Structure formats: structure tokens, C-alpha cells
Amino acid sequence: AMAAQAGGPVTAHDIDPGRMRDIPARAARAGAEITVQPAPQGVFDIVLCDAPCSGSGSWRRAPEAKWRLTEDRLAELCTMQDAVLDAAAPFVAYATCSLLAPENSARVAAFQDRHPGWVMDFDRQFTLQDGGDGFYLALLKRG
């Protein structure tokens, strides 16, 4: 909603359509308009990749999730994260609610290895000390 308030059109897509059900109502409450697309279409100036992740940044609110994460599941998530990044636009904001480096800085580094023309403009790990759940954000652009 914050991006929509900046004046440009905002389009939302999730592989699980159920996760997008409440987006228009939530955006309207925030004074914004967000178009929901069941399948991504067209070319976008920037893509926010809210990648599937372990959710380790929110384990303080759901500690049982910590015990469900296995090495195999982490590897599966990392593979999905790579696929999300590889399908990106000319400018990408990559985000997870994870504190785990394999899902964050390691994914960005692997992406840059696969796509050498990309540079990272911003990279930050937000922790509980920042006043919320754990979160990671990297801004990437074609060099």
C-alpha cells in the first residue's frame, strides 16, 4: 500500500491465489489501490519478491515453526527463492521474513553469480532489536 501511495500502479501476484484475497480491502483501508493478477503479465519497473521462506524472523511469535524446519525443507526453500529471483524485472527488492543467511545474503550472492550484470544497491538484516520481527531486504538492479 505504501508503494501505491507513491503514485504508480501496483500489481500483486502470489502463486497461492488465496493469499491475495484480502489485498484489495487492505489496500483500500490504507488509501491505496492494488490490482491483483492471477498470473503475472506484462513488464514491470520493479518487483518486490516477498520470497517463500522459513519464517525464522517471526519464530518469537510462532516458536513451534522452528522445530518443523529441516535441512531438506531449507534446501527446498532456497531453490524456490532462486527461482523467484531468476524471474525478476530490471530492478528487484528481495525480501524474506527470515534471519537465516542461506535464505538471504547467500541467495543474493548466488543470484549475482548466475547473473553477473546485477549489482546490489542495499542489503540489510532487520532483527528483533529493530522493533519488529526479523526481516531481510536487498535491492538489486541491472548494472
State what each model feature region is.
Residues 1-143:
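S-adenosylmethionine
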